[in-house]
Structures are given as structure tokens and as C-alpha cells.
Amino acid sequence: MVKKIGILYGMENTFPHAFVERVNKKNVKGIVAEAVQIGSVRQAFPTDYAVIIDRISQDVPFYRAYLKNAALMGAAVINNPFWWSADEKFFNNCLAETLGVPVPKTVLLPSKKRPTDTTELSFRNLKFPMDWHDMFDYVGFPAYMKPHSGGGWKSVYRVTDPQDLWNKHEETGQLVMMLQEEIVFEDYFRCYCIGQKEVRIMPYEPRNPHHLRYATTMKTTGPAAEKLLATIHDYVLRLNKALGYDFNTVEFAVRDGVPIAIDFCNPAPDADVYSIGQENFEWVVEAAANLAIERAQMQDPNKNNLTWGTFVQNSVRNLPITHVAEEVPAVSSETPAPKARKSSRKKSGGTNEAS
């Protein structure tokens, strides 16, 4: 019996095709890969796929519903569509604090405009005025205001004082925003995590144009660099195991030698060869192909084949949120990405732009 691995994708081109080609090139007995094909979606009816890699359902609700049905009927969907639907960035920050992973000081802000079909009576539980001074004293200025959910670097604002915040908050409509401490950093990293075990730590410059963000090098050197990479590796695994993501990126801004998690809710992260570079692209294609094959071999159509994070697992078992079932492995010598060419652009200040 042949098991199919499907990839569901949108406008991206380089990663999906390379992924399918890589899986098929491995010529594993009983495993083939292709782009997902959907002709009709019947309730409680299985798909043709043992494994589906999801790269687009965050933008297409029809696909998200299709994937939930596929998962219910035994497909191993990467990433878990039920958790992805429930997850958002403010919760991620809250969970990170319970896990001992440093994050910027962050507060949640109500939307500027009321949600559709609500009135002022819908908000009688909010104090008026809210304790803005307490929030501002906690977070400080400058700060970043960005949506509490979603991504793609959309609707992210740097605010310098309360009046600047009010002015920019006017532009956010019905978006629920969060206000986050600005981190002025000496190093910045973006990290792939595949299968909650494979980690790729990449020097990253979020202030560069999109196609040059990986054109940078690690600034920390010597024993401090080794310690920093080991800590980042630990935090990446800790976060992804708690959240239950099998394909994700985590971003860290390093301030005074401490890696601070800026963004770690990216279940369909950028994997385009023209932005991440050839060597990083090769790594993520290989890691994703190996993960998909492994999951296809393990997949049992009569069971739930989704990955659930330790946050959910421990809740079901009535264990503490921070309970860890096994030790996190030490960082390997192959973890750091190769150094990229240096950018000649000068930088100043910090950023929490990732959203």
C-alpha cells in the first residue's frame, strides 16, 4: 500500500516543489509526495493523504476546515490545524513566561473600533478609563504595537510616547493589539524547528530589506557564543514542545547576552530560497522531507495522528504547565547556520517588528 504525502500551499513556489522532489528522490518504499489535490470535501470522509504539510490554511478558511476533517479521519497534518486555529501571539508570550523563556514586557490593548454587532454595552466589564499609566510604566517607551494574532509583518508600529500610541492606534480599526517593550539588541537570530527536534539557528537582521535579512553574521564570539547558542537551542525546543508545532520559526533578540523570544508563532514560516538563501533552504527542505516520511511511516489511519503540545497534554493529565517529560538534548555542532555575507548598512536602535 502506497502512502501519499501532500503539501498544501499558495503563492510560494520554491519550497513546495523542492519538498515534493526531495521526498520522491529519496525513493522510500511505499511513500510518494505530491501537491494536495481537492475535488470535493465530504464530511467524515478520509482524504488520499497519510501526511499533509500545511503552508496556506491561515489565509484560506476553506483549507483549514478541509484539514480538520482530514485530521479527524486519520491524516497526520503538520501543523495541527486545531491548535493553530486556537493559538495567538499574546498567549504565546504568557506561556513562554511560565516556561522560563524570556520575552519582552507585553500588555494587551482593546481594539480601537468595536467588533461588528457589538455596542458600548458589550464592554461594561472594561474599566473606564483603563489604567493606561500602569501599562505605560510597565512596558516603557519606545515600544512596539502589533496585532495580538496573525503575522506577516502587518500593522506593526513603533511608538515613542502615549500621544504617538493614540495617533497610531486610530489606524488599527477592529484589530486587538498588544504593546510590547522595545528590545535594543546586539545579536538577532531566526531559528527553524522541525519535528520538535531539528533546530537551525540563523543570524538574522530584521531591519534589512526582506531579501537581505539573512545577510548578516553573529556578533557574539568565543565561549559566550557557545553558551548563547546552547541557550537558544534549549529555548527553541522548549517553546515548540509546549506549543506542539512541528514546523515553526522562533526569533530571538539578544540583549546583554540574554536571548529574548520576540516571535514564535510562525506555523507556516518563510522558506523561499530567494529570501533565506541556498544553504538554509537546503537544510529546511531536507529536514521537512525527513519529518514527512517519518510521519507517513508512523501514521495509523485509525488513530489521531496529530501532534499536541505539552501545554495541552499536561492539561489533560492534570499536570503542571511547566512539567517536562524528558530532558532537552544539548546543542549540536551542526546547529548554527553558516555565516552569510555582511551587509554594509549601518544600524541603530532595536526592533520587535516580527509579528
Region locations from a protein language model:
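Phosphate-binding core of ATP-grasp and ATP-grasp-like enzymes
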Residues: 173-176, 182-218, 233-249, 253-260, ...
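Intrinsically disordered, polybasic Lys/Arg-rich low-complexity tracts
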Residues: 332-355
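A short acidic/glycine-rich loop-to-helix N-cap element
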Residues: 273-280
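A long amphipathic alpha-helix within ATP-dependent nucleotide-binding catalytic cores
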Residues: 211-260, 286-300, 304-327
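Active-site nucleotide/adenylate-binding loops and adjacent lid/helix of ATP-dependent enzymes
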Residues: 2-9, 71-74, 82-189, 195, ...
